[in-house]
Amino acid sequence: MTRLLWSGSAALVLAASALVAACGSSSGGSRFNGGTGEDGGNGGGVTDGGFLGDSTVAPPPLLPDDGGAFNSEAGALTISPSAPTVTVTLGATPSMTPLQFSATYKGATVGAQWTIDRGELGTIGVGTGLFTPATLGGVATITATYQGSTVTTPLTVKIVYVGYGDPNAPDAGAGGAGGVGGVGGSGEGPGATSGQITALNGTPTADPALLFLYPYDKTVFPQAVLPPLLQWTLGSHTSIAAALIHISETNYDYKGYFQPPATPFQNQPVPQAIWNAVAYSNSGENVSVQVTLLDSAGALWGPISESWIIAPGTLKGTIYYNSYGTNLAHNLCCAIGADGTDDGAKFGGATLAIKEGATDPVLIAGNDSECRVCHAVSAGGSTLITQQGSSYSTSSTYALTNSNLETVVPNNNGDGRFTYPAISPDGTLLFTHETASALYDINGTAITGVTGIPSKLSAFTPAFSPDGTHIAYNFAGGTGSDGASIASIDFAKATNAFSNAQLLYTPPSGEHAYWPSYLPTNAGIVFDVETVYNGRDTAGTRSQCDTPSSGQGGDGGLQPENPCHSEGSHAEIWWVDVASKIATRLDNLNGKGYLPPHASYTGTNGDDSTLNYEPTVNPVPSGGYAWVVFTSRRLYGNVATINPYWSDPRFENISSTPTTKKLWVAAIDLNAKPGTDPSHPAFYLPAQELLAGNSRGFWVVDPCQQDGTSCVTGDECCGGYCRPGEDGGLMCTATQPSCSQEYEKCSTSADCCGVNQGIQCIDGLCSQTGPK
């Protein structure tokens, strides 16, 4: 499995001496790696381009650590200074002064050996005690050792960054398929003038009409995701000359002064290096975000304020999704042009993927002659299955571990049973969708000797649990079915035996629950509840019609303004606790009570919080959260603002105006209590194609790496562990250590090094059990 480092420029420098210096107790240890044997810690991991002049980002591995803390005998050995704070100024006027530590033993200064447990914060001379800070903030532990005695002191590093523009700004250009920086908008503006900077440091006037559109207040972001695009309302202010972006947390403070990248000045991305530094300097506290605006008349307005949460972990895997309107394939005809008529241009229906560090998606299934859209993916990342556009009863599998090799899965029954099957995590089995459900191998051959499937069971939108021991589904057919409820059944692969079919949740009359997906713990299931049916595709997301008939208010021609083209399916994301069968709507994820109004929406139910569909859960938790990717037709700030149902290029021109049909990601607290809402406000998934309708994201882990392959964490490795190799670099291995680090293999929680610090064995990996 390849760790998904959405920020792109990742570098990992490993040294055996740094590993030795960094290892401490099982609850600590350095998160970054680097440095040499000449210093007592890791060489810096993240630089910001302002002080050190580049934007390299080192992802933070949890280094191998089998326990064994230093034995402190501090009565005779002391450190000076005690609990110091070092402040580093970066950006336009950088300033950094090393800090000299000294050790005293029985009243005399001695030559101690020095180490630091967090080398990403700086280095310390092993024999000199001279600490040189890097470019991240945080609290480290400095240890002095002399004649068998050790003593420690905390060291706080605070970073203050003041920037005028961004010295490492990306090329705005055309932005690629994913938009500028993978998030759209107008890119970064130039630095503010000296006069504007002086004015921006003044006292602003509050204006309640100035509000953040995106990101949302209290959004939880993972580390290493691409930086978000800040988007705000302007109220009555028509001419903004400059803006101050102020992002602060306990040990990192950033102020960026910018002129507009475009008119109107209504969005600005967070600089990449700043975003990385904020994420890796965070220690669990909320991040304060403020934007202050200077108008052309010299009046200062704001600040617009909110806060975010940074999860202490990176996201893992690849997201596979279908795109309707993609420019990466041209197999459908024809798109509407700017004049509202069919211009003969082809567009694509295809399955795409967002890979490590990308700002744009790549084509996986489909080409210029064949549409490939309806799909499912195995949680282990080995296999994708998708329906053929030329014959809906026929599907194809794609070997994601073998250059996406396509194999046709014939269906002589002609009933589309392989359109949306559940795929076992290892990619070897299919549990069929909708028709009389049965178990098949990945080539479409029925498995013999299967027992326990209820008579005439029709499992619609089925999904395996991450460990392959359960399947959840919409109860579409069979004894007691209603076509509306979520149910589950247990599965034992060794015997192909099914058992314990049970009903989990039935929505109110007239509503239907679809698209279940298990949380990594198997304790809960996320699904959507369709509250308004569009009248034409079950469990869909589309409008009520494409070409309105006279009875629908049109004449059968291309009239996108007609009511049935502007109204469609509504759905909300819920979760159910499997043990108690208590279901709860995820209001924080859905956006209840805080999403901005959708001004372009002409439907009768104009609430964006009811436009959320098709959730799937990343099988690997990270930072104490499960991560859900889902389809939404909500506004994306001021970038995607058209009617939510205008996403089909044949009936609406989306070649230059982004549709709102996009993929979003939300964090869910692990081990939440039944009946509570453990979700958090969602963020826009970076790198998806901006000028296309995107949906049905599958977040899966990448195929594991063999022993001897470089790694960052153990979940990338087939052997289950990521440990130092002969050259000091982290390598995949099957050799079992005395205890497993986070993301390494486990059988029980007792296998995990951090079991006393809340680390437990979840789906075979040591993982945090909840947010810190």
For each feature predicted by the language model, list its residue ranges.
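Bacterial N-terminal signal peptides that target proteins for export
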Residues: M1-L12
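Ser/Thr-rich, Pro/Gly/Ala-heavy low-complexity intrinsically disordered linkers and tails
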Residues: W6, A15-T87, E120-G125, G129-T132, ...
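Short S/T/G/P-enriched beta-strand
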Residues: P64-T104, T150-N201
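Short, hydrophobic beta-strand segments
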Residues: G129-T135, Q272-N276
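A short beta-strand micro-motif common to beta-rich folds, especially ectodomain repeats
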Residues: G137-G148
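Sequence signature of WD/YWTD-type beta-propeller architectures
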Residues: V162-S710, T733-P737, S767-K772
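Secreted, cysteine-rich disulfide-bonded mini-domains of extracellular proteins
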Residues: P703-K772
